[in-house]
Amino acid sequence: MNIQALLSEKVRQAMIAAGAPADCEPQVRQSAKVQFGDYQANGMMAVAKKLGMAPRQLAEQVLTHLDLNGIASKVEIAGPGFINIFLDPAFLAEHVQQALASDRLGVAMPEKQTIVVDYSAPNVAKEMHVGHLRSTIIGDAAVRTLEFLGHKVIRANHVGDWGTQFGMLIAWLEKQQQENAGEMELADLEGFYRDAKKHYDEDEEFAERARNYVVKLQSGDEYFREMWRKLVDITMTQNQITYDRLNVTLTRDDVMGESLYNPMLPGIVADLKAKGLAVESEGATVVFLDEFKNKEGEPMGVIIQKKDGGYLYTTTDIACAKYRYETLHADRVLYYIDSRQHQHLMQAWAIVRKAGYVPESVPLEHHMFGMMLGKDGKPFKTRAGGTVKLADLLDEALERARRLVAEKNPDMPADELEKLANAVGIGAVKYADLSKNRTTDYIFDWDNMLAFEGNTAPYMQYAYTRVLSVFRKAEINEEQLAAAPVIIREDREAQLAARLLQFEETLTVVAREGTPHVMCAYLYDLAGLFSGFYEHCPILSAENEEVRNSRLKLAQLTAKTLKLGLDTLGIETVERM
């Protein structure tokens, strides 16, 4: 049930009947304050100006055509021409009943699309670090939301699995006579990588061998391909452990690394030349883009092939977008890549559009995000100033949560405590990130994220268990409750019901904008409204059975909404805390 969409259409029709153009925008929004009703239509100002009318005069005319019978109990004009809409308690009660009768809580399915989501993208032969966290969990929240709404989602883990580093690694492994890569842990590979890089920089003979190995690997030599595959396998096996710990839906089947696009690159360069988009410049192949200017104010040159014949990330990203449209048949492509890559992506996509590889009707969206900072406001590092490995971060989260949970539940059995600590610890790390607007940097703070107050995972998980405890005390099952009517008489009942029915609107925003913090804010607000409702509207000690059962149904929908909302974020719920 999308009340905002329903009201928008009703107000738009009334505006047209009052003389507004057919493309008028009613600007129906959820009201910020309860005294302004549940929704507010703010579109009169812009339209009245075009019509040469006073906004309030237009609002009065719109009201004469606005039929909200059975939806609103009151509609009023406020200020210069805002229209405040107060939902009818009977309408709220009816739709709470409908939401409870639906497995999807009354959430409709939009027109199905094929949506490719590019996220996580770790590098082969390196352990995942905290820099991979945001892309991985924000991207996964978007995937979960889009899948719940019924879209066909293709996860694309754009792994860094190609390039000169593989020549280096294979050459160094060979030198050490440790070619059986299958027996190595990833931590060994990280050490190998550092040693290989050192030799590559200092030993010209070794560097030359590494460069030759890259050529052999790229030409398809089976020995080198097999070594490369082993390196990829070790890395992705280790990464899968991290994905599973994070409760992220990525699997090995979702890997679409840089190597996938490599065979396409010569053809793309040739095609861009044939189309007159790419030209030779100082031995390299370059596309000059009018949309981007260099320091001299001239069109910026984007290199797609170096003079030594090598390709660049831009070339791969052009091939990648082309593949996602032509082969995966994407209707929409979302990229969860940090904000520092924005210009690079915009340049690649400008070339993609000019070449006609992806039509304008298929959005390519950079859902960029900021950095994770320490308490000092600088990039999050270890005490020694090194990169924090993601596995180490999750270990610490689990240890801190274990202490916290044991303190609150000294008699809890060990296996139950471990399960609860895992849900709280991993949930806390994820929720702390997801609850912040992804476009901004955020401060990583253990104390804040593990607090049982405020917009945190422990608070939300506790709020869910609190609602469940009402049912345990009520000793009533869902079947018994199903036949009971919902009756809304108190203001707090109406406020809770209206917020519950805004779940679909929240999902729609997250799906459109890729902003899971909107869901976090909604769930936190919902938990707060339930708390106020629980305090002021007695449930178990209600004046009669009808009111008791009606309030239990509001509690039931609250629990289901919290659980489903947290699930779209990849946050685990627990039955008891």
Swiss-Prot record:
GO biological process: arginyl-tRNA aminoacylation
UniProt main location, coarse: cytoplasm
PROSITE patterns named in the record: AA_TRNA_LIGASE_I
Keyword terms of this UniProt record: Aminoacyl-tRNA synthetase, ATP-binding, Cytoplasm, Ligase, Nucleotide-binding, Protein biosynthesis
EC assignment: 6.1.1.19
One Gene Ontology term of the molecular function aspect: ATP binding
Cross-referenced InterPro entries: aa-tRNA-synth_I_CS, Arg-tRNA-ligase, Arg-tRNA-synth_N, Arg-tRNA-synth_N_sf, ArgRS_core, DALR_anticod-bd, Rossmann-like_a/b/a_fold, tRNAsynth_Ia_anticodon-bd
Keyword Protein biosynthesis: yes
Subcellular location: Cytoplasm
Assembly mode: Monomer.
Name of the protein in question: Arginine--tRNA ligase
Organism (species): Escherichia coli O6:K15:H31 (strain 536 / UPEC)
